[in-house]
Structures are given as structure tokens and as C-alpha cells.
């Protein structure tokens, strides 16, 4: 499980859609769980055309699901293996992991419940990833910590993902920094996606 977090417009959704597209292009099935309504099939087709890939059937191996609540999001992961459309997915993308949790359980008064539910959700995903050899790509928003920006979900997310990458927008480029190690790469945004 890998988390990509950053401010709005830092390239999280772009990266998530491109990962699903690359999985599809490689002959794998992907499940794209959209919590914010940001999935755009026409953008995927544009990336494929710009890269010289055919678009026929390319989106047939990307299963799209929109979730509007934390319970719906959690239930989808719990039942994924038993459903024909999703059990063969080798990549699961959740864009954005914490959105439904912060919407359903807002404010400091709900922090313990929110973090507990998020912990259960992440633990179930980690178990599914291990048992079914499935990769998870999670996008996340940021909040301001005592010193710098941190991904929403804090230690709960940090402890259960295998890697976290902070994305920062720099003009038409995006810098990805591995947290906490600090190594980074700079990639360009364009018609063909992130290069």
C-alpha cells in the first residue's frame, strides 16, 4: 500500500488515473474507487492517445466505483473478493482515502471514532493486499501539523502504508518526495500524463 498526499492540484488524481491506465495497458484489471467525483474517462483516453496507445477496450479493465460514505467505502473493500467484477483486480486505487471519513465524522469531537474506523479500513486493505497479492494506491489530502503539512489520518495512515510520497506542484511539474527518507524526483505534467 502506497500513499500519495499533497495539496489540492498537486497531481494526486492525475497519478492515480495514470496508474490505473498503466495497469490496464499491461493487461491487469484495476479498481478505481472515487470519493470526490474526480475520475475522468476522457482524460484517460487523452493520455492513451498522447502516448500512442490504442483506446479500444483500454477502459474495459478499469472498474469504476463512486463511494459517498465511509461505510460504503469500507464495505466495498470487504466484499471485493466475492464480486465477479472486482475479485480479479490486481490494483486498487482509492482517490481520496480520507474524504468520506472526514465528511461523515467531522471535527475534533469525532477524531477517535474517525481514526478508529480508518484504522479498521486500512487494516482490512493490508490484509487483502497480502492474501490476494493486490497493490493499493491511496491518495490523501493534507492538513497542517505543528511543523509542516502532513497527510490527513496522521499516524494511523503512516503505520499501515508501506510508503508515503508527498506531492508538491512546481509550475507544470510535480515533485514527489518519499517520506520520511526525503529522496525526491521531479516529473512533468503534459498531454501524456506525468512523465
Regions flagged by a language model, labelled:
Residues 28-29, 61, 88-91, 129-138:
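Loop/turn-to-beta-strand initiation segments
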Residues 36-39, 68-73, 98-100, 142-146, ...:
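Conserved nucleotide-binding/hydrolysis micro-motifs of P-loop NTPases
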Residues 65-131:
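Phosphate-binding/switch loop-helix module in NTP-utilizing enzymes
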Residues 116, 123, 127-195:
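Phosphate-binding/switch region of NTP-binding enzymes
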Amino acid at each position: 500500500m502506497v500513499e500519495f498526499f499533497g495539496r489540492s492540484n498537486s497531481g494526486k488524481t492525475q497519478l492515480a488515473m495514470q496508474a490505473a491506465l498503466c495497469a490496464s495497458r499491461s493487461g491487469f484489471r484495476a479498481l478505481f474507487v472515487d470519493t470526490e467525483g474526480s475520475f475522468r474517462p476522457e482524460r484517460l483516453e487523452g493520455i492513451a492517445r498522447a502516448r500512442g496507445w490504442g483506446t479500444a477496450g483500454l477502459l474495459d479493465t478499469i472498474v469504476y466505483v463512486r463511494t459517498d460514505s465511509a461505510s460504503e467505502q469500507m464495505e466495498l473493500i470487504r466484499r471485493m473478493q466475492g464480486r465477479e467484477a472486482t475479485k480479479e483486480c490486481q490494483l486498487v486505487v482509492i482517490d481520496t482515502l480520507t474524504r468520506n471519513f472526514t465528511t461523515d465524522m467531522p471535527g475534533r469531537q469525532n477524531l477517535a471514532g474517525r481514526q478508529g474506523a480508518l484504522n479498521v479500513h486500512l487494516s482490512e486493505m493490508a490484509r487483502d493486499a497480502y492474501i490476494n497479492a493486490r497493490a493499493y494506491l491511496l491518495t490523501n489530502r493534507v492538513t497542517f501539523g505543528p511543523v509542516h503539512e502532513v497527510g490527513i489520518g496522521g499516524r494511523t495512515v503512516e503505520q499501515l502504508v508501506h510508503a508515503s510520497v508527498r506531492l508538491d506542484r512546481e509550475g507544470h511539474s510535480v515533485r514527489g518526495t518519499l517520506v520520511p527518507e526525503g529522496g525526491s524526483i521531479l516529473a512533468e505534467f503534459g498531454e501524456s500524463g506525468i512523465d
